[in-house]
Amino acid sequence: FDMELVNKGELTPIYFGSAMNNFGVETFLHSFLELAPYPSPKQSKNGLVDPMDNNFSGFVFKIQANMDPAHRDRVAFVRICSGQFEKGMSVYHVQEGKKIKLAQPQQFMAQDRTIMEKGYAGDIIGLFDPGIFSIGDTLSENDMNVVYEGIPSFSPEIFARVHVSNSMKRKQFQKGMAQLAQEGAIQIFKEINIGIEEYVVGAVGVLQLEVLEYRLKNEYGVEPTVNRMPYRFARWITSKIDDPDELKLTSTTKTVHDSDDRYVLLFENQWSIDWALENNKGLELIDHM
């Protein structure tokens, strides 16, 4: 056992126990308090930010809708990276360039919520989100130049076409798809010249599609139809193109838009990617944004 390797993320302590039988839980929690490292400096676009810096700053790393089904609330989870947080303080939403008040910060323990009065680097706070936050957003008390690097996203490897047959449920369907995509649980794409009554969904694993279907049914009252598609790769076009229809692509390649209206090509295999690059001079593709 080497604590230095643990702090580097190269070694992970493992505890055996049972939460259901309350065996080993207390031992784990006490050890966790002893082993957990102090908050480390966080990389921003302008360099490392010291957790002891007086300026409060943090970033949104998770968004969760419908945590309380009775109120249809949406919570943005923020990790404090520096300074001291206080309930009711005003901070800059750096990406929007606006000042916002953090009026009802919450702390979560299982199903219990408590109002959080103060917080420090390393703490997690939950903020009510009326739709102004996105994953990766930076909050800063005084310094608008603090911009933390975004959360890395993984290129989807499983794709499905998702639609709802009941036209009366279309509004709930669109809301559910948009909110679940904002959480980062899935990536949604729109086929060109096709309306928003159906989406192409990209996921890293099959479980994400199952969770999507379950949450649409239970949280939004929608019975979706999910049909798997044969694609295995998504590639974003970074080179300038006027008309994607002018690209020379294999017959099995599909062109779609992502949620920010960027062109994305869906491929069935690596050969199709290589063929597109060889037959379209200047075409540049990346596997995630």
Model-flagged regions — what are they?
Residues 1-289:
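Structural and coupling elements of P-loop NTPases
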